[in-house]
Regions:
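Conserved active-site and cofactor/substrate-binding residues in soluble primary-metabolism enzymes
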Residues: 1, 45, 53, 73, ...
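Rossmann-fold NAD(P)-binding glycine/threonine-rich loop
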Residues: 69-76, 80-81, 89-118
Length: 342
């Protein structure tokens, strides 16, 4: 999805592409991406060959944190070679100092950055820029923030990612989802809550969670199949940063199968949005919708995925300019998208 955007960008030069699917190895990258032309770059699974190209950065769209060992092994090889990494894979790394990040996830990256004098930046959409860059930028327009909430309000009807075991969508309500366990939920999604607290100069009292399910009274169809009546077709969870006994920072998700699911739960002014609600002086309310308007027919989920990939790509020059080590959204300057207007 990102490669076609790289090849036409005036700032970036694609020098190599690594793949994990054996069926893609040895094929021209243009063919792999379904482009009308070849690129003269062969997809490879040879990491040493990619490192030998001496790129300015690896933009890494690897698997999720469920594959931590694989991700860490690959990323550290590039960092030790002095190659900066901008990744969307290990989302707990959006805030590396979060207390739930295990040392064996953090220490190898720290050591590799020191050895190679390289930097490692992790981003995403949520957790990521929709609940770190967006709310913190808007907080900078206030004299006082009483509460700040960043919400993902998405219809998962066309989403094909994993959510049954993780969220409980599509399953009987009595089956406990992985994310109903508070520490797992905070670990997977909550890194931006302590990040915002740090940026605001406060120390949270504690982080709490809520998790609710909505059971569909009728059968529903999605891209992944049929959800029978009586099963979960929407979930709502919150991760809450408490300060002075009150929830001051909140991350919220409402994910549903069908716009009419869980009608009493929050929705956007249009479907599929990321929203920031700040109660303060002044209060600010912002909704962001990612869409394709090029007639391609690609949906909002695909637009959000592309934006996520491009956040990592566009961060490369700024990350190159930083001192070695971990990089978070708080370390980056404004990234206005040089070369995007052409």
């Amino acid at each position: 999805m990102v490669i076609p955007e790289i090849v036409k960008h005036p700032l970036f030069e694609l020098v190599g592409v690594g793949v994990s699917n054996p069926d893609k190895v040895g094929r021209d990258v243009g063919e792999v991406c379904g482009l009308d032309t070849t690129l003269g770059i062969t997809a490879t699974d040879d990491i040493d060959a990619l490192i030998a190209l001496k790129p300015d950065a690896l933009v890494h769209y690897g698997p999720t944190a469920a594959h931590a060992e694989e991700n860490i092994n690959l990323i550290t090889r590039f960092l030790r070679a002095g190659i900066d990494v901008c990744s969307t894979a290990m989302t707990p790394w959006v805030w590396p100092t979060m207390h739930l990040n295990p040392p064996n996830w953090i220490e190898p990256i720290t050591a590799a950055c020191e050895l190679g004098e390289a930097s490692c930046f992790t981003t995403g959409i949520d957790p990521g820029f929709a609940n770190d860059l967006f709310p913190m930028t808007l907080m900078g327009l206030c004299s006082e923030v009483r509460t700040v909430r960043a919400s993902e309000l998405l219809d998962y009807t066309n989403y094909t990612g994993d959510y049954e075991r993780e969220m409980g969508i599509g399953r009987p309500p009595e089956k406990k989802a992985m994310l109903e366990t508070p520490d797992i939920l905070v670990f997977a999604w909550g890194g931006t809550v302590p990040m915002i607290a740090h940026a605001a100069g406060i120390m949270l009292d504690e982080i709490t969670t809520t998790y609710d399910k909505w059971v569909t009274p009728n059968e529903r169809k999605s891209a992944k199949g049929v959800i029978p009546a009586g099963n979960v077709a929407a979930v709502r969870f919150t991760i809450n940063g408490l300060y002075q006994g009150k929830t001051r920072i909140q991350l919220e998700h409402v994910n549903r199968i069908g716009d009419d699911a869980a009608p009493d739960w929050p929705t956007g002014n249009q479907n599929d949005v990321y929203r920031v609600d700040i109660e303060g002086t002044p209060s600010i309310f912002q909704e962001t919708a990612f869409r394709f308007t090029d007639g391609s027919g690609r949906d909002a989920a695909a637009a959000g995925c592309l934006a996520t990939g491009l956040r990592a790509l566009n961060a490369v020059p700024a990350v190159n300019d930083l001192s070695p080590g971990w990089v978070t959204a708080l370390d980056l300057p404004l990234i206005p998208g040089f070369g995007t207007i052409r």
